[in-house]
């Protein structure tokens, strides 16, 4: 049995109602898991780009891409081999935590403090998914109150 590999697939679609539903139905109907899904319109066009992170054997990934190609609003499917991939995380900390230490840690992970109020500090980091994992592990000592993480975005090199 082949090992499941993490894969990033971009799908260019016509930006119309129910496209996202059809794509997620394709995955769920066949028992494939979507680890991360990000969708945004492509500027100055009537298209959107979906970035899907999934996992599966080579055969499963081939099946997914073939099925995606068959969907009517799909214009292009890109299975990334050599890519730049980023994720973002917003983290809320109590104001009682050390601002300088949090700022230094954020800087090490392509991030910064984006908001400070009387009660909380909000930070943002944007980096490779593994580095976002490391950041989220490293910040535990600052007692984060809330963490929100985006899905992946990717471009072929």
Predicted region positions:
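Long, contiguous binding/interaction regions
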Residues: 1-48, 53-157
């Amino acid at each position: 049995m082949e090992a499941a590999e993490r894969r990033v697939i971009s799908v260019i679609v016509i930006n119309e109602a129910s496209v996202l539903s059809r794509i997620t139905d394709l995955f769920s109907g066949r028992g494939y898991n979507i680890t991360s899904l990000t969708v945004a319109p492509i500027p100055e066009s009537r298209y959107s780009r979906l970035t899907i992170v999934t996992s599966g054997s080579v055969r499963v990934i081939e099946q997914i891409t073939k099925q995606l190609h068959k969907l009517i609003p799909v214009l292009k499917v890109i299975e990334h081999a050599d890519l730049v991939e980023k994720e973002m995380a917003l983290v809320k900390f109590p104001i009682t935590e050390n601002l300088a230490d949090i700022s230094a840690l954020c800087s090490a992970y392509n991030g910064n403090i984006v908001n400070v109020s009387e009660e909380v500090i909000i930070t943002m980091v944007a980096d490779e998914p593994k580095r976002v994992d490391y950041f989220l592990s490293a910040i535990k000592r600052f007692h984060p109150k809330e963490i929100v993480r985006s899905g992946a975005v990717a471009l072929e090199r």
